C-alpha cells in the first residue's frame, strides 16, 4: 500500500519522499539526497506513530532507499535497513493474491504498489470473462514483475503470454504462481 506520495506535488517540501508498506516492512524512498539527521527525524516519527497503531509487541521494520546518483558517488549503500528486520522470504498479499517481494534489492521490489487499481481492473475483467466459450487469453507486453499475469490467472484467465524485459522476471512469475497454486 502506498502510504505517502510526495512526488504528486501536493505536499510542498516533500516532493522527494514516497512511503510504501510491504507488510511487515515500510520502505521510505527519497529521490533526493537525505541527511542522517533527516532520516533520524523521520525514523523517530515512524516509531512514534507505529507505537500507537502496531499490534502489541510488533516491532517497526523500515528500509530507506535513495534513488539518485549522489549515493553512488559518495559510496554509500543505495538501500539500507534502518530498523527491525525484513522477512526472508518476504511475501505480501493484495486482494487475496500473494506476491514475493524484495525490498532490500534494487528499485524493483517485485510489486508496483501504484498499479493496484490496474491489477483490480484486470482481475475484474478476467473474472467476468472466465466462463466465455473460448476462455480469456491475455497478452502481457510489459511483464516486468508478472503481477498482472498472476492476477489474470487467479481470476480465471485460460492462458497468459508474457513478454519479459529480463530473464529475472521469469523467476518472479514462477515464484508468484507457486505462492498462488497456479500451474
Describe the role of every protein-language-model region.
Residues 1-40:
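Polybasic, low-complexity RNA-engagement segments
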Residues 2, 61-65, 140:
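A structural signal for short, well-ordered beta-strand segments and their strand-loop junctions
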Residues 7, 12-13, 18-20, 42-116, ...:
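Non-catalytic substrate-recognition/targeting regions of SAM-dependent transferases
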Residues 38-39, 114, 169:
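Hydrophobic (often cysteine-bearing) scaffold residues that line and stabilize catalytic clefts
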Residues 123-183:
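Conserved SAM/SAH cofactor-binding pocket of Class I
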Amino acid at each position: 500500500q502506498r502510504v505517502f506520495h510526495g512526488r504528486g506535488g501536493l505536499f510542498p517540501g516533500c516532493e522527494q519522499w514516497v512511503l510504501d508498506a510491504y507488510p511487515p516492512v515500510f520502505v521510505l524512498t527519497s529521490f533526493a539526497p537525505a541527511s542522517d539527521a533527516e532520516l533520524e527525524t523521520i525514523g523517530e516519527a515512524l516509531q512514534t506513530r507505529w507505537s500507537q497503531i502496531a499490534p502489541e509487541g510488533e516491532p517497526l521494520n523500515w528500509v530507506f532507499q535513495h534513488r539518485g546518483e549522489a549515493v553512488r558517488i559518495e559510496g554509500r549503500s543505495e538501500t539500507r535497513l534502518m530498523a527491525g528486520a525484513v522477512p526472508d522470504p518476504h511475501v505480501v498479499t493484495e486482494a487475496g493474491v500473494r506476491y514475493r517481494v524484495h525490498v532490500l534489492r534494487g528499485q524493483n521490489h517485485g510489486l508496483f504498489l501504484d498499479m493496484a487499481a490496474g491489477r483490480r481492473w484486470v482481475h475484474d475483467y478476467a473474472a467476468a470473462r472466465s466462463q466465455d466459450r473460448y476462455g480469456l487469453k491475455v497478452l502481457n507486453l510489459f511483464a516486468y514483475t508478472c503481477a498482472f499475469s498472476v492476477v489474470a490467472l487467479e481470476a480465471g484467465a485460460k492462458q497468459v503470454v508474457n513478454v519479459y524485459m529480463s530473464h529475472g522476471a521469469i523467476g518472479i512469475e514462477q515464484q508468484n504462481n507457486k505462492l498462488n497454486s497456479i500451474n
